[in-house]
Amino acid sequence: MSLKSTTSSLTTNNHDKTINSVQSLVNGTGTVADHNPYDEVPYESYPYAITNPYHLSTLATLFGINAPEVENSKILELGCAAGGNLIPHAVLYPNAHFVGVDLSKVQIDEANKNVRALGLKNIEFHHCSITDIDDSFGKFDYIICHGVISWVPKIVRDKIFKVCNRNLSTNGIAYISYNTLPGWNMVRTIRDMMLYHSSSFTNIRDRIAQSRLLLEFVKDSLEHSKTPYAEVLKTEAGLLAKQTDHYLRHDHLEEENAQFYFHEFMNEARKHNLQYLADCNISTMYLGNMPPKVVEQLKAVNDIVRTEQYMDFITNRRFRTTLLCHNDLKINRNINNDDIKKFNIIFNVIPEKPLKEVDLNNATENLQFFLNGNKESNLSTTSPYMKAILYTFSENLNNPLSFKQVTSEANTKLNNTKLNEIKNELLNNAMKLVLQGYISITNQKHRSKPVLDKPKTTQMVIYQAKYTPSMWVTNLKHEPIGVNFFEKFALRYMDGRNDKKAIIEAILGHVEKGELTLSREGQKIENKEEIRKELESLFTPMIEKFCSNALLV
């Protein structure tokens, strides 16, 4: 069964494929307009879960910082594009205040259009340079600068650090992401190749097209080569070839593209009285994920920046997501098992068997649980206590649970007789799994089970489903969740007032108007009752998907 919208405004890139080799290139024609490159090829404005203020708040709490409460905070984003990373928060947290700054007028105009349509009063966007930010902007509890500092001149980079100091509240947290060395060395080789190859073309669309041809040329040229250099180059070229035009334009064909060793970045941060708090990918900080011999040697370094710099060398790291705070704040890096009790926990595991088919008290049965539903990544256990814990998490996918909730629900699965054993099992394992990157901790609250008779999503999701061409919507964890055309039409009507029958009738209306077509085994379904049956068969799996992906409230 496949779905297709006849009114989708999505377009595909039809670059000329008749040029089969670099040798047949011709000189480019046309000129690039004298304005911001992000106006020429706007960067699609995504939500980035790693920048979620709740995630920043959680990591600050883990390391002993009393971070500001997100729902009543002031949040600034530098290089906000069209607001895709900021507007969803403004919808969810009406008592917080949000400010976005971007140099692209096209992007800011789009952001303001969306704000007006959503009727938001707690967010504002400014078409200006980061260098225009001064004390009049005020203090912010969270400052987000994602995918900017590596792509701007030094004068702007210096200003970013200055803003992260002068405009950051006392216990505030600043997030900056950037390209790092040594990992970017190979990527830089390909970037240099694309810049060299496309330099004779003035039109940016031609430069993007020629860069794609070069990537194909590189892959074809090295097809039979098995040297380490060739293997790495082929892999990098293959990854880049799959990226969007706006990614190639702004991440690789941009005039500015600076990479830093971590210690160099931190030297700049220290000049502005900022200190290293954490990396948003906390598992990258954990020495226990390194080989034992490496761990013993790095433990002797006794300097967090130097330690992580050595780890970057070893892992060939290419991108960092660094959290900074004022240098007078006291950071506690002594994490212990009991710290898990401070947070709510998300552990997305899918059991190999339904609970009703399992005897949890059978300590001889080894059960598998798949991480994020991936059968290639799993954990197994014979422990009745851990089985009860994991089944509890599997019933609450993407929904944070407190330590008390997990242990209490798990205990009910064992007839309310093993609470202490369950607590000990969770305490002995949870924090290690956090540091290994399997379990997520958060300051976000647990959500009540959604009412499925009349499903309800957020105002943001309904708006995205109705008015944007993108085939994704933003969930409650600030993640983009892919949707198909049927799901996108259905989401329009999930405002808590429509039941299954009403939603299906509404979608049928779109089918009758020719806005949505359904097919089975390549054949279009024409009969209205057959269409209705098809929609009904799709409805329950869709609702299950929305529940497990934090799209319903």
From Swiss-Prot:
SUPFAM superfamilies: S-adenosyl-L-methionine-dependent methyltransferases (SSF53335). It comes from the Bacteria. Coiled coil: none annotated. InterPro entries: CFA/CMAS, Methyltranfer_dom, MeTrfase_reg_dom_prd, PKMT_C, SAM-dependent_MTases_sf. CDD domains: AdoMet_MTases. PANTHER family: CYCLOPROPANE-FATTY-ACYL-PHOSPHOLIPID SYNTHASE, FATTY ACID C-METHYL TRANSFERASE. This is Uncharacterized protein RP789. It comes from Rickettsia prowazekii (strain Madrid E).
